[in-house]
A protein has these predicted regions:
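An edge-strand/N-cap motif at the start of beta-rich repeat modules
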Residues: 1-40
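Beta-propeller fold detector
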Residues: 8-13, 83-89, 127-136, 189-197, ...
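Repeated scaffold domains used in trafficking and secretory/extracellular systems
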Residues: 18-24, 43-51, 91-104, 135-154, ...
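Short loop/turn segments that connect beta-strands within beta-propeller blades
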Residues: 77-80, 121-124, 181-185, 250-253, ...
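Loop/turn-rich, solvent-exposed surfaces of beta-rich toroidal or solenoidal domains
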Residues: 229-230, 264-299
Length: 352
C-alpha cells in the first residue's frame, strides 16, 4: 500500500474580507538573496534552497477580492498572522493575469508581460523593474498575441517559467516562456517562448494542431519540468481529460523524459482527469477532477526524485482543505466553499 504524508496544524487563518479563491501560491524563506552574495547569483545557484528553513518562512497566496472591481491581493501568512497586500487596479488587465513568483525573502508579480512589480523589505513600496525586451519593436521573443496566465510555477534560480496562451483564449495555457531575472542588477528579459512537443505523448491527438495544455511549471537544478493535463479543447469538467503527464522538457519544449503518463482516459467510458501543481519541494500535488474516480476525489503527491506516489492525511477537522504548496516541512492548505473561507499552515509530521 501507499505511504501517507501526515500533516498537523500550525495555524489556521480566517480571512476577514471576501476573497474568490487561490490563484497561485509561493513561499518566502527567511534569507535575503543579497546576503548570499553576488557570486552565487552569477553561478546561478539556488537562492531558495528546497530545505526552506522554518525560521521566518512565510507563505504567499495570490487571490482576488469578491467586491467590485475584483482587485488582486497577495496574502502573506506567517506565524504572527496575515498581511494583505492589495495590488492596484492597473493589474486588472483584460488579457493578462499577473504571475506571482518568490525569491528568497522577496517576491514579485510579472505584470502584463512588460514589467515586474518587486516587493522587498516590509513590502510597503514595491519597485517597478521593466522587462527589457517586452516592447515592440525589440520583442522578438514573445508573440504579440501571447497572454500571460497566473498558473503556479516554481523556480530555484534566475529563470522564472511563465504560462501563456495564444491564438485562442479559453483561460488555459498551451505555451510557456522563461523570464531571466537578476534581482541584484534589477534587470529582466524574456529568454524563450515555446509549446510542448505533442508527439512525445503516447495519447496525443493527431487530428489537431493543439499543443498540450500546461497546468504548472518548475525550474530546479537547471531542469525544466512541466505538467500537462492533455489536449482537449472541450470542458474537462464536463467531459473529462484525454490524458495527463509529467515531463522534463527543454526550453524549446522538447520532451526529454516522461516521469508520469496516464492511459488514454477517454477509452474507459468513465470521465476522469488529474491536475498537477508543482511546489517548493520535491513533491508534485495531484488533484483529481472528479470525486467518484479511483482516488475518491482525494489529492495525492508524486515525488520527482523517488518517482512514487504518496497519500495525504490532513489534520483533524480539515479534510475539506486542499493542499496548495509545500516547502521543507511546511504545507499551505485552503478551504474553498463559494469563496476562500480558511487557510491553513501545516507541518509534515512524518511519512507512514
Amino acid at each position: 500500500s501507499m505511504a501517507t504524508l501526515k500533516l498537523s496544524l500550525i495555524q489556521k487563518y480566517k480571512p476577514e474580507k471576501a476573497y474568490t479563491y487561490v490563484y497561485s501560491t509561493g513561499f518566502l524563506s527567511g534569507e535575503s538573496i543579497l546576503k548570499q552574495g553576488a557570486d552565487s547569483i552569477e553561478e546561478g545557484n539556488a537562492f531558495m534552497s528546497h530545505a526552506c528553513p522554518d525560521q521566518g518562512v512565510r507563505a504567499l497566496i495570490l487571490t482576488r477580492k469578491e467586491e467590485v472591481p475584483g482587485a488582486y491581493s497577495v496574502l502573506v501568512l506567517s506565524e504572527t498572522g496575515m498581511q494583505e497586500i492589495e495590488l492596484g487596479e492597473d493589474f486588472l488587465d483584460r488579457e493578462n493575469d499577473p504571475l506571482l513568483f518568490s525569491f528568497g525573502d522577496s517576491f514579485g508579480l510579472i505584470k502584463a508581460k512588460k514589467e515586474i512589480v518587486y516587493f522587498t523589505g516590509d513590502f510597503s513600496s514595491p519597485e517597478i523593474i521593466p522587462i527589457k525586451n517586452s516592447i515592440l519593436p525589440f520583442s522578438k521573443v514573445l508573440p504579440e498575441n501571447a497572454r500571460e496566465r497566473y498558473f503556479q510555477t516554481v523556480s530555484d534560480g534566475r529563470l522564472i517559467p511563465v504560462c501563456f496562451e495564444k491564438d485562442v483564449y479559453y483561460g488555459l495555457s498551451r505555451c510557456f516562456g522563461l523570464l531571466d531575472f537578476d534581482p541584484i542588477k534589477k534587470e529582466a528579459k524574456w529568454k524563450c517562448f515555446s509549446e510542448m512537443e505533442k508527439n512525445a505523448f503516447t495519447h496525443h491527438d493527431d487530428r489537431t494542431k493543439d499543443a498540450p495544455k500546461i497546468d504548472s511549471l518548475k525550474m530546479a537544478n537547471d531542469a525544466l519540468y512541466a505538467y500537462t493535463s492533455g489536449e482537449s479543447t472541450g470542458s474537462v469538467n464536463k467531459w473529462g481529460m484525454d490524458y495527463y503527464a509529467l515531463a522534463k522538457i527543454s526550453p524549446e519544449g522538447k520532451v526529454k523524459e516522461k516521469l508520469l503518463e496516464s492511459e488514454q482516459l477517454k477509452a474507459g467510458g468513465k470521465k476522469s482527469g488529474v491536475n498537477g501543481t508543482f511546489t517548493h519541494s520535491d513533491y508534485l500535488i495531484l488533484t483529481p477532477l472528479f470525486n467518484n474516480d479511483d482516488w475518491k476525489g482525494k489529492q495525492k503527491l508524486f515525488s520527482l526524485s523517488k518517482r512514487e506516489y504518496l497519500d495525504i492525511a490532513m489534520p483533524r477537522g480539515m479534510t475539506k482543505h486542499s493542499l496548495h504548496n509545500i516547502c521543507g516541512e511546511l504545507c499551505l492548505t485552503a478551504l474553498y466553499d463559494r469563496g476562500l473561507k480558511e487557510i491553513g499552515l501545516c507541518k509534515i509530521e512524518g511519512i507512514e
